[in-house]
């Protein structure tokens, strides 16, 4: 979704798309701590508090601005002549994006995926606010935190669960390190 949005914002430049880019990336400037109480009230009102669906919708909403921003900055480096040659060959805008431009975004896509997955996997505050009341929907980091109590801390369980929580992030980073470096360098 973010890559297609960034493609349209970059290729169809006018005052409306410039305004849309500003509106889409503006939430990156607002710290989560300033909206967390009102967000919790809204999610409780619409019965999404305590559910995995509600948590997923929030992660999706918070991740879109950064992903669009990263894709947009990379799109600016792709020459427009590539689009024009695809149009000459008879491709429409969607085919140009899906068959020509999107394969060029492989390294940036992996970078966005790794950044988002690591952010979601390691996040503590949002799941603590939204799904802490139910044992079925707790994340692994919250489950590790449940071993730390006010008067008693079970360090052996807490440390074992933290190792399990850190392990997937390390494995993902090691496997996709090449793409992460390419994506960060390409977007610079």
Question: Where are each of the predicted segments found?
Answer:
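A structural signal for multi-pass alpha-helical bundles of membrane permease subunits
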Residues: 1-188
């Amino acid at each position: 979704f973010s890559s297609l949005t960034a493609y349209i914002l970059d290729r169809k430049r006018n005052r409306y798309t410039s305004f849309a880019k500003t509106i889409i990336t503006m939430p990156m400037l607002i710290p989560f701590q300033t909206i967390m109480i009102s967000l919790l009230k809204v999610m409780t009102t619409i019965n999404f508090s305590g559910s995995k669906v509600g948590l997923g919708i929030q992660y999706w909403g918070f991740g879109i601005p950064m992903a669009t921003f990263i894709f947009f900055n990379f799109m600016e480096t792709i020459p427009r002549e590539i689009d024009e040659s695809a149009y000459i060959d008879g491709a429409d805008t969607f085919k140009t994006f899906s068959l020509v431009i999107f394969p060029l975004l492989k390294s940036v896509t992996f970078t966005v995926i790794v950044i988002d997955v690591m952010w979601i996997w390691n996040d503590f505050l949002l799941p603590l606010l939204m799904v802490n009341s139910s044992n079925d929907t707790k994340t692994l980091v919250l489950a590790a935190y449940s071993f730390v109590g006010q008067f008693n801390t079970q360090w052996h369980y807490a440390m074992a669960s933290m190792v399990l929580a850190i392990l997937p992030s390390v494995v993902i980073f090691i496997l996709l390190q090449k793409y992460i470096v390419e994506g960060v360098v390409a977007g610079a």
